[in-house]
Amino acid sequence: MAYEYNEEWVPQTRLGKLVFDGQVTSMDEAMDSGLPIRESKIVDLLLPELEDEVLDINMVQRMTDSGRRVKFRATVIVGNGDGFVGLGQAKDVQVGPAIRKAIDNAKINITRIKRGCGSWECGCGLPHTVPSEVNGKAGSVTVVLKPAPRGLGLAAGGTARKVLEKAGVKDVWTRTEGQTRTTLNFAKATYNALMNTGTVRRPIVFDETEA
């Protein structure tokens, strides 16, 4: 079924046209298509329950020939609390436009993470934690996520907790290294760790019959 109520959006990409025409009706289908998401409206239509949260607003300055230029840099996390999460940042001379641009960038950067019950202490089989230990790095910050039993909660710092909540991870152990006071790198490292949940390598099982 095509999206008849969205006359203002004129899709510019192949995936956007497929979504607009109703040929792609879920974010899973969009991800499985192999086509890049380059329009934030795609995410608006496929994940209407998506929530966003501003992680950081910072003022940045740059000297030019005409003098000092000041802009605001916004860092935003978006997620549906059920396996989809995106991180974005943007700059503008005003805070409001910077936030809106960062939200759009976060939607374009949305990714599907893999969840499971990877803790040997649990075994419930529900997708409440990460499937195995993963790590992410950004700048000087390294974040390690470890599977935790159901009911433990998020043993994570403020910025990492917000990213994990938006991704739909309910229980996890974390370990951090580096300057975690830098919100941007802390958020990026956590986000990168979550992205790595989909690229976990399984251990090689040797056939004992081969000798």
Swiss-Prot record:
Signal peptide boundaries: none
What InterPro entries would the database entry show? Answer: Ribosomal_Su5_D2-typ_SF, Ribosomal_uS5, Ribosomal_uS5_arc, Ribosomal_uS5_C, Ribosomal_uS5_euk/arc, Ribosomal_uS5_N, Ribosomal_uS5_N_CS, Ribsml_uS5_D2-typ_fold_subgr
Q: Name one GO cellular component term.
A: cytosolic small ribosomal subunit
Ordered alphabetically, the record's keywords are: Ribonucleoprotein, Ribosomal protein, RNA-binding, rRNA-binding
Q: Does the keyword rRNA-binding apply?
A: yes
PROSITE patterns cross-referenced by the UniProt entry:
RIBOSOMAL_S5, S5_DSRBD
Q: Which GO terms describe its biological process?
A: translation
Under the heading Gene3D superfamilies, the entry gives: 3.30.160.20, 3.30.230.10
Question: What's the family?
Answer: Belongs to the universal ribosomal protein uS5 family.
Could you give the domain comment from the record? The N-terminal domain interacts with the head of the 30S subunit; the C-terminal domain interacts with the body and contacts protein S4. The interaction surface between S4 and S5 is involved in control of translational fidelity.
Q: Which PANTHER family match?
A: 40S RIBOSOMAL PROTEIN S2, RIBOSOMAL S SUBUNIT
Assembly, per entry? Part of the 30S ribosomal subunit. Contacts protein S4.
What name does UniProt use for this protein?
Small ribosomal subunit protein uS5
Species source reads Methanococcoides burtonii (strain DSM 6242 / NBRC 107633 / OCM 468 / ACE-M)
